[in-house]
Amino acid sequence: MLRTHDLGSLRSEHIGQTVTLAGWVGRRRDHGGVAFVDLRDASGVAQIVVREEEVFHGLRNEYVLQVTGTVSKRPEGNENPALGTGEIEVIAEDVTVLNTSDPLPFQIDEHVEVGEEARLKHRYLDLRRPGPSRNIRLRSEANRVARDLLHHEGYVEIETPTLTRSTPEGARDFLVPARLAPGSWYALPQSPQLFKQLLQVGGFEKYYQIARCYRDEDFRADRQPEFTQLDIEASFVDQDDVIRLGENIVKAVWKLIDVEIPTPIQRITYADAMARYGSDKPDLRFGQELTELTEFFKDTNFGVFKAPYVGAVVMPGGASQARRALDAWQEWAKQRGAKGLAYVLYKEDGELAGPVAKNLTDTERAGLADAVGAKPGDCIFFAAGEKTPSRALLGAARVEIGHRTGLIDPTDWAFCWVVDAPMFEPAAAAVASGDVAVGAGQWTAVHHAFTSPKPEFLDTFDKDPESALSYAYDIVCNGNEIGGGSIRIHQRDVQERVFELMGLDKEDAQTKFGFLLEGFKYGAPPHGGIAFGWDRVVSLLAGVESIRDVIAFPKSGGGFDPLTAAPAPITAQQRKEAGVDFKPEAVKPVEARKAEAVK
């Protein structure tokens, strides 16, 4: 046994006991003839008193020590109430250096700012710091709480494959060459979606796992190519059942940070969320809802406002902004693909000013403030054009206004469910936003191709896809989507109709999803589920800005790993063995390969 006690466990009741401890050297203080060492392990820090000068002078930061000594009360006035061990110290009798340390690339101190590149390159050192260590331990606790709750509810934890076939699910797959089948490839799963549905067919009525998922996406802010979901699926449930379970999980994990989340959590339709907040993940910690002005400006002479949609959002106190600040808003809008952000300043004296105001009629000027709920001293921002991008711009401006004006209390928690989302969107729009359309049709799924339509659209979704609403539900916290799910399609003919609408004919559907369609032939039960983005959930609990801060070994921008320098080239021998460059004359059908395997 290298130690008898954890450092952080020592208290006044241990005074007089001989203990053996192990840990890393933190701060060292030489007081002439006696030295004090802060020794640290995973449980905390304890002060070690070293009286042998020769021993002390040989120690350096982050040396690994084993110390045997006697627990003593600190001299009066030297207690440290900030430490759990602050009432005691250990008088060292024997000090053994278990390992030395080279000079550090940065200090193991949470009060010292360290660049992210250095932190990720030496992540094993970064994890010794209190903040990163605390985040990873919080993640472990969140895992435990979720598992305990789900086991109590009768859910079974089941691992699904991480080597599967490539199936279009809305993003690009990471592909893995199959050495024993040259020219064939596995794919890493974007989610356990198809397997968890087949588990329902298999009679596992309540399934969950903490699943690793992989998506080869273009770089987006705060995304990781590999990420974690708390993945859940159940048979014989409706939307209310799944939402109720999701709320119980949220309540349980938020209790880890002593926050009580009231339930039921409010529900907002997708249409309302977009109209009122310009986002399908609205931040409800503050108001400042959007106002549609299309009808208000229907007879306008101002060319900019002769548009399919005109909307506005109010910035309280914004009329006092300097010209430089107003110009900066234009640059802000251009970075989001807009031409600019029109505005009217509602002066304290009641006058309207700014470049837009002079283009308005007297009637429009007289009614504008009341129409948008502006007060003297406010600034009114406008967007005009196609409805979707205009609302998105105003929604982003709303959040920016909330931050700039202090309307958002960072200690608040505001949750909502967004329900009744469209089932389909134009495939071109999905591709433009960075997603991958599943088929070659004009329409693709908003959530995924396995989401059921709401019952009232079951007979018409493929005839009028633009109007069809899905049986989907997303949970949002402070403007972050932290989970999403749906009631699934469980009837083969309905699933085939969805595939056909999305441009997958029967042959394509059979090739890509035949195993799922086959399963649906044998009494698939009605089922539904939800998946929480676990990295995002834990980052919110930890109060950090990036999900990288709650992942033990995250990737940096573009999916690069500074620690291992992955991805990296492979050798010529590896390429040959893996069959990366293999060019088959013709890929044999699945049935032929199965027949050969049987032989």
Swiss-Prot record:
InterPro entries: Aa-tRNA-synt_II, aa-tRNA-synth_II, aa-tRNA-synth_II/BPL/LPL, Asp-tRNA-ligase_1, Asp-tRNA-ligase_1_N, Asp/Asn-tRNA-synth_IIb, AspRS_core, GAD-like_sf. Its main location: cytoplasm. Pfam families: GAD, tRNA-synt_2, tRNA_anti-codon. Keywords: Aminoacyl-tRNA synthetase, ATP-binding, Cytoplasm, Ligase, Nucleotide-binding, Protein biosynthesis. The record marks H31, G77 as: Important for tRNA non-discrimination. ATP binds at R215, D216, E217, Q224, E481, G533, W534, D535, R536. Residues 193-196 are annotated as: Aspartate. It is found in: Cytoplasm. GO terms for molecular function: aspartate-tRNA ligase activity; aspartate-tRNA(Asn) ligase activity; ATP binding; nucleic acid binding. SUPFAM superfamilies: Class II aaRS and biotin synthetases, GAD domain-like, Nucleic acid-binding proteins. GO terms for cellular component: cytoplasm. Its EC number is 6.1.1.23. Homodimer. Aspartyl-tRNA synthetase with relaxed tRNA specificity since it is able to aspartylate not only its cognate tRNA(Asp) but also tRNA(Asn). Reaction proceeds in two steps: L-aspartate is first activated by ATP to form Asp-AMP and then transferred to the acceptor end of tRNA(Asp/Asn). This is Aspartate--tRNA(Asp/Asn) ligase. It comes from Pseudarthrobacter chlorophenolicus (strain ATCC 700700 / DSM 12829 / CIP 107037 / JCM 12360 / KCTC 9906 / NCIMB 13794 / A6).
